[in-house]
Amino acid sequence: MKRLFGIVLSAFLLACSNPQEKAERLIDAMGETAQAGGDAVVDTSGWQQKWTVLQAAANSTDQDSLWARYQMISADIQASVPGGALYAIRTYFQVADSLPSRQEGALALFSAAVTFEEKLSDRGRAIQVLTMLVDRYPGTHMAETALAYRDVLVFENDESLLDKIHEWQTQESPPTP
């Protein structure tokens, strides 16, 4: 009986020390916080612990999809920390470069573009990354989304595109005969 208890206790302790289980519990907790009206990713308290758990899980998995999942979420956490945007972008690019023929690569590039625009206010680089996404993944749903977002970044300003066209037309009136 003592031996059976020891085996069960050992299995439980191993399960608790599994980095992937810790990461999944963390992701679930962050999701529950977000559903309850909180902002799990914006809450930067304990971000290093969260990042460490996700990186340990990413390093311990053999599956590309799980590795990408943990890396992307850890990058999201990095992006939420003041001064962490460039580290997040680096992580997104690592995923994109490591998985160039998978949808996770496209999602990573899109996330990098959003981070450039939202966190660093660098529309030029965001547009470059979106163009890279369209070139790497032509004809995909992510490419279509990237094109739409790129158009918003290119044409969006204080005035709408139609207002700009109207202003241009009124400034250059046709010559009178």
Segments predicted by a language model, with ranges:
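Terminal, low-structured helical/coil segments at or just beyond the last alpha-helical repeat
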Residues: 141-177
